[in-house]
């Protein structure tokens, strides 16, 4: 454990236990709700206006804005080399510490993503903006924006909106705005959809 660099104007609503290793960063002006039992390992970068339910673990992850992370989610879990003599990396690598993480390929959770309870996202995977991942899914491959994916391994079952609407949502960039501006942009998008 170590210090978590947070800007002076950052606001985190914390549960009883939040463990952060050094190298965990939050954006300036951050406002997140982080429930108890959450552990963030370095390096992690967290956007604004996210909700982390209890007992979330994140390793080497980049998380966008306005995400809802369900209870018991595991982000950025590493693989063990099952073809090596030992499954323990420190034995195979001759290192004193476990070297399982691919720091050059973080796990990326876009903005406005909803991860249901107990979702596992493997290291190096990208989940696109607006995607929804069903409870207990194991995400082993990239998931496109606004997709709905479920299962083990997670597979895209449908999309939240039609292709044209997804394009408009992504272009609007509403999830990069503060809440009041984001709400206004979303209202405008709703009005445009009703006209069609």
Model-predicted segments: where are they?
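Extended, small-residue-rich solenoid/repeat segments and analogous flexible loops
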Residues: 1-40
């Amino acid at each position: 454990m170590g210090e978590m660099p947070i800007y002076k104007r950052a606001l985190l609503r914390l549960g009883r236990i939040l463990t952060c290793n050094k190298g965990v960063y939050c954006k300036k002006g951050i406002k997140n709700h982080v429930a108890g039992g959450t552990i963030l390992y370095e390096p992690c970068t967290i956007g604004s206006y996210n909700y982390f339910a209890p007992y979330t673990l994140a390793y080497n992850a980049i998380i966008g804005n306005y995400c809802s992370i369900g209870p018991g989610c595991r982000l950025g879990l590493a693989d063990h080399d099952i073809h090596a003599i030992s499954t323990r990396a420190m034995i195979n690598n001759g290192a004193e510490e476990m070297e399982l993480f691919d720091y050059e390929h973080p796990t990326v959770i876009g903005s406005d993503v909803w991860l249901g309870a107990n979702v596992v996202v493997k290291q190096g995977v990208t989940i696109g903006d607006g995607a929804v991942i069903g409870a207990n899914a194991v995400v082993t491959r990239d998931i496109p924006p606004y997709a709905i994916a479920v299962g083990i391994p997670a597979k895209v079952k449908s999309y939240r909106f039609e292709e044209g609407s997804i394009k408009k949502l992504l272009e609007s960039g509403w999830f990069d705005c503060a809440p009041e501006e984001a709400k206004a942009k979303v209202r405008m998008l709703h009005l445009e959809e009703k006209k069609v």
